[in-house]
Amino acid sequence: MSFTVAIVGRPNVGKSTLFNRLVGKKLALVDDTPGVTRDRRPGDARLMGLTFTIIDTAGLEEADAESLQGRMRAQTEAAIDEADLSLFVVDAKSGLTPVDTDLAEMLRRRGKPVVLVANKSEARGSDSGFYDAYTLGLGEPTPISAEHGQGMLDLRDAIVAAIGEDRAYPEKEDVAVTDVDIPQSSDEGDEDEEPIYDDTKPLRVAIVGRPNAGKSTLINRFLGEDRLLTGPEAGITRDSISVEWDWRGRTIKMFDTAGMRRKARVIEKLEKLSVADALRAIRFAETVVIVFDATIPFEKQDLQIVDLVLREGRAAVLAFNKWDMIEDRQAVLADLREKTDRLLPQARGIRAVPISGQTGWGLDKLMQAIIDTDKVWNKRISTARLNRWLETQQVQHPPPAVSGRRIKLKYMTQVKARPPAFMISCTRSDALPESYTRYLINGLRADFDMPSVPIRIHFRSPDNPFEGKKRRT
């Protein structure tokens, strides 16, 4: 992207609505409640031939530096310093407030280009607020309606005028396309070849867990900066925020998510939106780290989150956070491992790593567990090896007999990876008990070293060409 733009303004003037309009997706949560956005969120904006990086920010308010609102303000000011240009959004419908005046003064002191945007200009009675915006001393306001998409051409022209045509439209260079991602090995390929794991591709990782488990603190420690809001208050994170960083030469894209509580406790509409956003992050990720509070682990909600991640087909890693607060670490670790095996039988062999997001202890081991788990999630096994294995499994533990006739497993192949899924051709597939399926899944985990990822097996009976036809008498 050629330049970076920060959207700033007081709460509830329509910043996130404008952000979603510019990126062409509903990435940021939008609600009538003031202060929905808390962290700064970057995105790729496209505006009538103009491309740039856009940053959505929290509403600016006067607040004590140590308060939640004060920490939100610090995040927004960091976005302003990072950006080349600020879109200062005011509400033309409700008019100016003293906060708008203070923000205008703060932006002037920064000395960077500012485009004054009068949002909600389609509303009846907005003319007064539009003309009042001139008094801020930031030039002519650009009237728009972020909700309805009106005034976007004028907004583009104002951005180009503020940033300069050379920055807005840099000369395009002929660049060979080398980063097109066409994943073939995950769903198709030579059945007799087992593809080599590609450790150069960016890895998408979602960080999930109960409120106040330390998810944002963990990501900040990875990044080495206070990129995300943290604090003692539960439920600080609302949007799923993505950040990128490099680990041993590999790009990692991490998604911080809102804390997930039990459904019965989720009453507010805004929290429901936040949880839905977290679910989307899980589905978009490749590997999901479920963060447990090691001081109070294995709450019912922890187990439900793990089950949800596995049902979505994601690779899963457990992180027992706040390890710096544990005294008898050896005894606690042994207890946690015993409970993991007992309470999460569907995740047999799942990698569990004790960490401290506060001090950074154990984070290298956690990252290695994430990479190792992703390798398993992408694993493919040749058809020849699978059928030799299937024959051995049936010798050791034959399938049960149904109505006096034993079920025969004839052929096995892997139909996809991410997560690994297999198809077995057999007789009477509808009569095969669940216990035998579990036996095969556990065998695959043990014999092909496939812990911590969901494994799917589909059984199929060959079509009977004579089914439905009358027998001759």
Swiss-Prot record:
Transmembrane segments: none annotated. Keywords: GTP-binding, Nucleotide-binding, Repeat, Ribosome biogenesis. GO terms for molecular function: GTP binding. Gene3D superfamilies: 3.30.300.20, P-loop containing nucleotide triphosphate hydrolases (3.40.50.300). Residues 379-463 form the KH-like domain. PROSITE patterns: G_ENGA. InterPro entries: G_ENGA (IPR031166), GTP-bd (IPR006073), GTPase_Der (IPR016484), KH_dom-like (IPR032859), KH_dom-like_a/b (IPR015946), P-loop_NTPase (IPR027417), Small_GTP-bd (IPR005225). GTP 2 binds at residues 209-216, 256-260, 321-324. GO terms for biological process: ribosome biogenesis. Pfam families: KH_dom-like, MMR_HSR1. GTP 1 binds at residues 9-16, 56-60, 119-122. Residues 3-167, 203-378 form the EngA-type G domain. GTPase that plays an essential role in the late steps of ribosome biogenesis. PANTHER family: GTPASE DER (PTHR43834:SF6). HAMAP family: GTPase_Der. Associates with the 50S ribosomal subunit. Belongs to the TRAFAC class TrmE-Era-EngA-EngB-Septin-like GTPase superfamily. EngA (Der) GTPase family. NCBIfam families: GTPase_EngA, small_GTP. This is GTPase Der. It comes from Rhizobium johnstonii (strain DSM 114642 / LMG 32736 / 3841) (Rhizobium leguminosarum bv. viciae).
